Swiss-Prot record:
Protein's name according to its UniProt entry: Cholecystokinins
Residue positions where Phenylalanine amide is found in the record: 58
Post-translational modification: The precursor is cleaved by proteases to produce a number of active cholecystokinins.
InterPro entries: CCK-like (IPR015499), Gastrin/CCK (IPR001651), Gastrin/cholecystokinin_CS (IPR013152)
The species this protein was found in: Canis lupus familiaris
Sulfotyrosine PTM sites in chain numbering: 52
Lineage, uppermost ranks: Eukaryota, Metazoa, Chordata, Craniata, Vertebrata
Alphabetically ordered keywords of this record: Amidation, Cleavage on pair of basic residues, Hormone, Secreted, Sulfation
Gene Ontology cellular-component terms listed: axon; extracellular space
A GO BP annotation: digestion
Domain of life: Eukaryota
Amino acid sequence: AVQKVDGEPRAHLGALLARYIQQARKAPSGRMSVIKNLQNLDPSHRISDRDYMGWMDF
């Protein structure tokens, strides 16, 4: 019974995490936020991200 109680919340969280990742990949806003995070972490990524955003506009 203890294993069943511990297993259910983990499976539920795993399902929510997988669902969140799928939505982040599909949603343009999710990609935009990833690009902004890369710009904040490393200035050298700004040029490549700017070209990628320009490519997304088409």
